[in-house]
């Protein structure tokens, strides 16, 4: 399996044109040529933040486009500035919901200071690195389908782990490999932050 694993090719396309009208995404991340993630980058020097990236996804990105379509195109979409990262797995134009993909700061929102660069550098310095990125794609992302009362169709979602979920599961896995099974753990997240999915 190691040889097959090493054959995986991760690539990043900057200013990726995704339609015949010349519209571009700041970043397109691919695995073996298949689109996995998109990203819009904003910088404070131009008076723009991740909120402008979210607005761009909602207002200027056609969710019917194959690359952006739910269950057909990229699995996750990131809105990024120097301080925060937000994400969604389902673009629905103005109805799109973005959630934070931040590390947390002093027990609250945002990201801690980074003496070596941007507060959001963990995204490309850690998360998008080959080992972790392939781990996320192979073991963490899943399709959720919940039945609703007829005639409503099933409620569907692609679940992409938030940063704290990813960190807690990877820490627990590493600890279990070191000390073995049989240990009890307490997972502490704030209300509505995905404890049940972390435990699962």
Identify the residue ranges that each predicted region occupies.
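ATP-dependent helicase/translocase motor core
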Residues: 1-200
């Amino acid at each position: 399996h190691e040889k097959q694993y090493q054959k995986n090719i991760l690539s990043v396309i900057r200013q990726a044109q995704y339609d015949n009208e010349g519209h571009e995404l700041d970043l397109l991340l691919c695995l073996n040529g298949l689109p996995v993630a998109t990203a819009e980058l904003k910088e404070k020097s131009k008076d723009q933040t991740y909120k402008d990236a979210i607005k761009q996804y909602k207002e200027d990105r056609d969710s019917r486009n194959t690359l952006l379509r739910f269950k057909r195109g990229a699995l996750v979409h990131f809105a990024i500035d120097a301080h925060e990262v937000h994400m969604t797995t389902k673009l629905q134009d103005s109805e799109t919901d973005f959630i934070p993909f931040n590390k947390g700061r002093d027990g609250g929102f945002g990201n801690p200071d980074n003496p070596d660069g941007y507060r959001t550098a963990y995204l490309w310095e850690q998360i998008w690195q080959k080992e972790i990125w392939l781990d996320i794609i192979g073991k963490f992302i899943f399709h959720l389908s919940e039945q609703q009362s007829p005639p409503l169709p099933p409620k569907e979602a692609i679940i992409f782990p938030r940063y704290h979920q990813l960190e807690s599961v990877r820490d627990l896995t590493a600890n279990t490999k070191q000390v073995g099974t049989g240990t009890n753990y307490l997972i502490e997240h704030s209300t509505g932050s995905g404890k049940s999915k972390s435990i699962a």
